[in-house]
């Protein structure tokens, strides 16, 4: 199962994580939160998580195949960068 993660160091990470979770939640098959980590289940297959620490937002993706993983990376990453007004940057998924 392909997995990846990306970290964005940013001021007020809680704000952007909450905004991302709220926005994505309207489009996801399911969304849940436990211990400060939001888990998003996508209808096409796979999950993403949104977590924060004191200085960053951490995104992870987990899917059944590489194509679905890339969709998750695109959805979570592009929206986070858009909300943070950092569209000219890219997240380094690994």
Regions found by a protein language model. Give the residues of each.
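Terminal, regulation- and interaction-focused segments at domain boundaries
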Residues: 1-16
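A generic structural signal for beta-strand entry/edge sites
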Residues: 3, 35-39, 54-58
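Charged, terminal alpha-helix-loop-beta segments
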Residues: 9-12, 32, 49-51, 78-81
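Non-catalytic surface loops within mature trypsin-like serine protease
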Residues: 10-12, 44, 65
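Amphipathic alpha-helical segments
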Residues: 13-25
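Ser/Thr-rich, low-complexity intrinsically disordered terminal regions
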Residues: 26-47
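Beta-strand/loop substructures that line and gate deep hydrophobic ligand-binding cavities in soluble
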Residues: 44, 48-63
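C-terminal structural segments of small proteins and small subunits
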Residues: 60-94
